Amino acid sequence: MEMQQNCSISCFWETQPLGCVKISCIFYHSKPRNINGLFLPPSSNIILQKETQEGIPPPTQSQEPLKPQENISRPIHHPLVLKTNFEEEEEEEGEQNDASSLWTKTPEEIEEKRAIKEMCYKSGEYYRVHTPSDISSSKSIASIVEKEIEKSLESGSELQEGDGLTVPTKFSLFERQGEIKASLDRKPRTDIAAFENGGGDCYVPQRIIFLGVDENEVLTEEKESTISKCSNAKVNDVHPVMKPHFKGVKKRKWIYDEPKNFPEPGMQRVQASNPKNKMSYHRNNKNKNSENASYIHVQRDAVRTVSLNAPPHGRPPHGSYNKADVNKEPKFKLCSDKYMSTSYNGSAWQKRIPFSKTYSKNEKIYTEPRRNGSK
């Protein structure tokens, strides 16, 4: 009924210059219409009534609601299909890898994998977080090791040559006390004597190797020299400092039993070149060393008297001592003189030091001091 009523009403857009443009316009049209090349005749009531009775819906109304449904349903299915394909491909690749691993495995590869696992396990134990129980156990082990080291230091049995705490095993305890001087400040000494003796902790074995003489003779002489040093400790100004509970060997101060300096360069060279003469010199003067003071103070006094009593212009410039050298220790002044290369002034030293003797008979001995211009 509504459709019939609408068909009786004329269309409003027909009065407009463009006319009605709607294809599915329900209102009555008295004029024909041309819409995008489609010709539509004027509407009649009979045709409209038949169409309404048959129940044929207009094509535009039925097609429009179906299109959005199709557009919505299409994008939902595609991603599902793609996902299933990827999963299947991954499963196939995994199966192929398993099959290849079963075929390619050899006993060598299996052993390598086991070794790698063991290494990883050990490294994990090393780098893992330590619990307080582990720390306490490690401390107990460290304390046991320290106690064992202290016992070995007290006994002195496990000490070897080359360590910083070496003790010469050939000497007795009394001789060790004479040789080893402990220092409380624990600071290293950089004396000239350490460099002259070749450095190191135990200079006596090093001097034996350097001279290349019999060890028994040197040891006997060193024993007597150490005994004389212990008796004349005030002269050397170095006292042995030993604790009652002495653990280990501490650093020692150097006691230099040999003369540090020589007034003549020829005397230094002769003594360095003839070690056997040096040993004979020590043998002849054993008793005098024990009675008199140490070599150092005797030679210092002799050098001071020589430097004070020497004529200012009578001695050559390379062998003289200036006034500034009176308060200082005498220093070596090496020269390239052909007369002073292999000789020394023996008679002058015999007068000044009564217990000094010549080193060898083959060397020339000048009885008189040489003057400037003398041959």
Curated annotation (Swiss-Prot):
InterPro entries: DUF5571, Znf-CCCH_3. Residues 54-78 are annotated as: Disordered. It comes from the Eukaryota. One of its GO terms (biological process) is poly(A)+ mRNA export from nucleus. Pfam families: DUF5571, zf-CCCH_3. This is Uncharacterized protein C12orf50 homolog. It comes from Bos taurus. The lineage of its organism: Eukaryota, Metazoa, Chordata, Craniata, Vertebrata.
